[in-house]
Amino acid sequence: MAYQDEESKEYSEKVVKIDRVAKVVKGGRRFSFNALSVVGDQRGKVGIGFGKANEVPDAIRKSIESAKKHLVKINFKGHTIPHEVIGKFKSARVILKPSTAGTGIIAGASVRSIVEKAGIQDVLTKSWGSSNPVNIVKATLDALEQLETPILAAKKRGISLNKLFGKD
């Protein structure tokens, strides 16, 4: 149990969205809640989770547990991302562009939460299409999963780093 307590301390959590939904039954409406959360260690690991329950705290707890189970390693070094990337999920599109040190995170609330939890400090973003926070967060995670360090890109293509940067 102590191991689990230590593990939970190193991750920071952010609730992106809480929604009340209703199921119409013969006696009226039965309300429940769902929550979308982002969890990250601010050193390159980030995850998103979705939880549903009859009470808000239970939905939040479930979403955070789900996010911790679905952590993804993001390939970046330093303060920004190595290259421009576009993430897609359903009709949501998110573009992430590297920026110079000191720029900060230029992003909407949904994109900002996942980029901050990943540990990226300087990035320019633009989202279009669906404005649903669930779709935007998943599109952002898709974009972050596409990131490659120059070493990985060169290895994948079977060329040297010098050739990758056009110095050969």
Swiss-Prot record:
Keyword check for Cell membrane: no
Disulfide bridge partners, by residue number: none
Any single Gene Ontology cellular-component annotation: cytosolic small ribosomal subunit
InterPro entries per record: Ribosomal_Su5_D2-typ_SF (IPR020568), Ribosomal_uS5 (IPR000851), Ribosomal_uS5_bac-type (IPR005712), Ribosomal_uS5_C (IPR005324), Ribosomal_uS5_N (IPR013810), Ribosomal_uS5_N_CS (IPR018192), Ribsml_uS5_D2-typ_fold_subgr (IPR014721)
UniProt keyword terms in alphabetical order: Ribonucleoprotein, Ribosomal protein, RNA-binding, rRNA-binding
Residues of the S5 DRBM domain: 11-74
GO molecular function: rRNA binding; structural constituent of ribosome
Database matches in Gene3D superfamilies: 3.30.160.20, 3.30.230.10
GO biological process, one term: translation
PANTHER family xref list: MITOCHONDRIAL RIBOSOMAL PROTEIN S5 (PTHR48277:SF1)
Subunit structure: Part of the 30S ribosomal subunit. Contacts proteins S4 and S8.
Domain text: The N-terminal domain interacts with the head of the 30S subunit; the C-terminal domain interacts with the body and contacts protein S4. The interaction surface between S4 and S5 is involved in control of translational fidelity.
Family the entry assigns: Belongs to the universal ribosomal protein uS5 family.
Function: With S4 and S12 plays an important role in translational accuracy.
Protein name: Small ribosomal subunit protein uS5
Species annotation: Leptospira interrogans serogroup Icterohaemorrhagiae serovar Lai (strain 56601)
Classification of source organism: Bacteria, Pseudomonadati, Spirochaetota, Spirochaetia, Leptospirales
